[in-house]
């Protein structure tokens, strides 16, 4: 589960390294975000020469969470970190590579470009 002030690792090569969640999008009272949810975040760490700079406000989609997620078949999936991918206003990734595994639940949310760039889909 991801909420306001949560620090996310960035799982792409957009130039950002850490994001801090400002808001979970999707309703006025939506407090927690899960895999596939879109958040508004601030870049807290960035590498020099990247597409995004420290202090930028970006949109990101959550691709990994430490909190387990229940699947339709009754199994649970959880990851070692909370991670997101920086996206543009068309919900497409701003980066050209995705690092680490991503969850299969992104397919139901129509993030096909992220799934195709990912090395491993779990």
Curated annotation (Swiss-Prot):
Transmembrane segments: none
Keyword Ribonucleoprotein in record: yes
SMART domains named among the record's database cross-references: Ribosomal_L14 (SM01374)
GO cellular component terms listed in the entry, alphabetical order: cytosolic large ribosomal subunit
Keywords for this protein: Ribonucleoprotein, Ribosomal protein, RNA-binding, rRNA-binding
Pfam families: Ribosomal_L14
NCBIfam families assigned: rplN_bact (TIGR01067)
Name the record gives this protein: Large ribosomal subunit protein uL14
């Amino acid at each position: 589960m991801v909420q306001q002030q949560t620090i996310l690792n960035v799982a792409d090569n957009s130039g950002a390294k850490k994001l801090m969640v400002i808001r979970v999008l999707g309703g006025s009272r939506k407090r927690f975000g899960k895999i596939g949810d879109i958040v508004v975040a601030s870049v807290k760490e960035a590498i020099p020469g990247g597409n995004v700079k420290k202090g930028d406000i970006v949109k990101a989609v959550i691709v990994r969470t430490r909190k387990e997620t229940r699947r339709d078949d009754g199994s649970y999936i959880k990851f070692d970190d909370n991670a997101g991918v920086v996206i543009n206003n068309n919900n497409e990734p701003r980066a050209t590579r995705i690092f680490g595994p991503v969850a299969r639940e992104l397919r139901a949310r129509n993030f096909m470009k992220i799934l195709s760039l990912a090395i491993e889909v779990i």
